[in-house]
Amino acid sequence: MISVKDVVNYNPEEYKFKSREIPSDLLAIIIYAYMQKVKDLGSDTTLYEIGYEVGRLVSPKSYEDIKKFFEANNIGYIEIKEKDNGEVEIKVKDCIFCRTQKSEEPMCDFEAGLIAGFLESIKNKKYFVKEMYCQAQGYDACVFIAKPLHN
């Protein structure tokens, strides 16, 4: 049986974003339209779950891998800070999905799931990630808090 990972065939060492093939602004518009359609159907959870699965498939080994993935794919520039209580704070500047949008609420459910999948791959434990602040709300960055889940 072929796995999704085989189909994706992602290799971080060889992967390069081909911005000439799909301009990042066009990709952002396409993804935004998709996200809005899913939200209109009342399923923010679906976006989170899709992001989570993508994060697990990419399977980074370090925070540096996450930073490289975000930058190589023009998603944004990130800062990652571990807190004493076990939480992880992730700040995404110049977020491709919301930097040109306006919203009263945080809107980056896909990225929250993506970060949860990334952290699970790195730390070997599950996290729940919530976006606290979003560029679409007028903040200078999207800020996510990742809380470890206890079994």
UniProtKB/Swiss-Prot annotation:
InterPro entries: DUF2507, NO_sig/Golgi_transp_ligand-bd, V4R. Gene3D superfamilies: Trafficking protein particle complex subunit 3. SMART domains: V4R. Belongs to the M.jannaschii MJ0150/MJ0739/MJ0745/MJ1460/MJ1642 family. This is Uncharacterized protein MJ0739. The lineage of its organism: Archaea, Methanobacteriati, Methanobacteriota, Methanomada group, Methanococci.
